[in-house]
């Protein structure tokens, strides 16, 4: 669906805020929630007085153009329409943070690993969230890409040298990359 589990919003936004990326790529923007929240908390909470002077780059990828609304054009600097498996390797921009929020389960494991590897090539850090218990999901909102194709587990992400799990009851949330060391192990969002 063009939305994601509301139980994970706090942990994801806290992680984005603590990393303070100057550039962010949101893969599978859907409703645009995380682009919107990143724009708000990275731009408006930095002590500035200029409300409409964005200093950070927030780009997105969306395979299903029917999800895009005029709000996306306000929040995102660029939205690339197409399959992330094709678009991510072709991107020339390097990002401080890449978001894969409730998207990796829409790929096979092989495709998901390839997408993650490509995201790690173009991004310093990748923030992933995927449901702990995947549900059967086929086409929704007339979008054939909404089908769940894989279930991911902790071990899929724990093999990365630079990673940390972010505590959540409903989702596996992992930060992969050097930013994992930035998040203090005593911080309440880190899983113990």
PLM regions: where:
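A short acidic, helix-capping loop that chelates divalent metal ions and anchors anionic groups
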Residues: 135-140
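A conserved beta-strand element that flanks and buttresses the S-adenosyl-L-methionine
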Residues: 99
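Conserved beta-strand signature within the Rossmann-like core of class I S-adenosyl-L-methionine
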Residues: 123-133
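Hydrophobic adenine-recognition pocket in adenosine-nucleotide-binding enzymes
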Residues: 103-106
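Conserved helix-to-beta-strand junction in the class I
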Residues: 118-122
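Conserved N-terminal segment of class I S-adenosyl-L-methionine
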Residues: 1-94, 110-117, 142-160, 166-192
